[in-house]
A protein has these predicted regions:
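A detector of single, family-specific signature residues
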Residues: 1-396
Length: 396
């Protein structure tokens, strides 16, 4: 039998269990400091370990992975699938249990991208977190404007528009006169709403309102700057290493350049990690769960999966369902007849992800499917249009 190791990783400690050919376990506790991980690596190599398995415990496994991947084949395991028997759970027994399952070939590894994709993923997920902060700051700025009775957000398309931000900046710099603030409003908005714009800018701004508004505005500008820095790094990696894949994904309706970078950061460009498109869809959390007992289906809700990938795929599906003339728009409208809009959107996202899998696997561009009608469908259409023609002729 192969010599393997199972690791139970915590914030400050790592419990390692090595199972050798004689099945006598070697168990030792290590520090999560870099020196401790290096010591762990040296010990495993000296005992002839080739494969190491560990649980995906939060972010604690990441630095351990970075050090050990230089010398070992690593397997990251979802803790849900290797639960210990109740009443027998200790750190040492957890490490021993992982090593035992690994030695018997019963572990299924999670997808861990290579170093380059991990870097791209860090930038992408950082951008998502900043986008959430941006939304919260926009809401904070709107609340503070309403407290001052500045109602320009009722007429602008969104809080982060150039018009609103120019007015906020002017207020922060001390300008409170409605006539001067009105000059900063986009001409189209002024022409459309006229006198209401002037009235919406006649607010009551206290010193405390100005201070809080200025703080929120400064935070907002910082977030926008940090977003641009992350996008610049994402652009660099994708342009240097994934230009063909970016071009292929861009041919799919509803997927723009930023969406393509996000998708690649989450799934990579090599589909060998996913045996079929169904595995990828399941990993993304876009397939119905199997919850059946005694012939009764209890739930068909989508499974928990990669929240970052599922989020961007639903956004792309929403855009594709509104792309005029696209196959996705027709399919979405067809599904909405018998399903809720939300379920139809998930179905479109699932279909898009299956297409992405095929494009990345075959290295081809997207070609819109041609609607092929069966003989019965053609006959029904002929009858329908013949009936409409008869109605028009009778009207004359």
């Amino acid at each position: 039998m192969k010599t393997v190791s199972g690791l139970d990783v915590h914030k400050d400690t790592i419990f390692a269990c090595v199972l050798q050919k004689d099945n006598v376990p070697f168990i030792k506790e290590y520090s999560t400091m870099t020196c401790g991980i290096e010591e762990l690596s040296d010990d495993l190599r000296s005992m002839g370990v080739k494969t190491v398995a560990m649980e995906s415990t939060g972010i604690y496994w990441m630095p351990v992975w970075e050090v050990l991947e230089r010398h070992f084949k690593l397997i990251l395991v979802n803790p849900y699938y290797i639960k210990q028997v109740p009443g027998r759970k200790t750190d040492v027994k957890d490490a021993q249990w992982i090593a035992t399952l690994l030695q018997k070939g019963l572990l299924k590894g999670s997808f861990v991208p290579d170093h380059l994709l991990r870097e791209l993923r860090e930038y992408e997920r950082g951008y998502v977190r900043l986008s959430n902060q941006e939304t919260r700051l926009e809401q904070t700025i709107e609340r503070q404007l309403i407290k001052c009775n500045i109602r320009i957000t009722s007429f602008a398309t969104k809080i982060g528009s150039a018009t609103v931000m120019k007015i906020v900046q002017a207020i922060c710099e001390g300008e409170v006169r409605a006539n001067e603030l009105e000059k900063l409003v986009h001409g189209r908005i002024r022409n459309k709403h006229k006198e209401k714009i002037h009235q919406s800018l006649q607010g009551v701004i206290r010193p405390c309102d100005k201070l809080l508004l200025n703080q929120s505005y400064q935070q907002y500008q910082l977030v926008k700057q940090q977003q641009n820095e992350l996008i610049e790094q994402m652009n660099r990696i994708c342009h240097d290493h994934f230009e063909k894949e970016m071009k292929a994904l861009g041919t799919i309706p509803g997927i723009n350049y930023l969406s393509s970078m996000t998708i690649l950061a989450e799934i990579g460009n090599d589909m060998a990690s996913f045996p079929t498109d169904k595995h990828l869809v399941s990993w993304a959390g876009l397939r119905p769960r199997n919850d059946e007992s005694a012939g009764k289906i209890k739930s068909k809700k989508v499974t928990h999966g990669n929240k970052y990938l599922r989020r961007i795929m639903v956004q792309c599906a929403w855009a594709a369902s509104r792309t005029k003339g696209s196959w996705f728009q027709g399919k979405f409208q067809q599904l909405c007849v018998r399903k809720s809009e939300r379920k139809a959107l998930i179905a479109i996202a699932r279909k898009q992800l299956m297409i992405i899998y095929l494009l990345l696997q075959t290295k081809q561009d997207y070609v819109a499917p041609v609607q092929m009608l069966t003989a019965d469908q053609k006959q029904r259409k002929v009858k329908y249009y013949q009936k409409q023609l008869d109605v028009l002729l009778n009207m004359g």
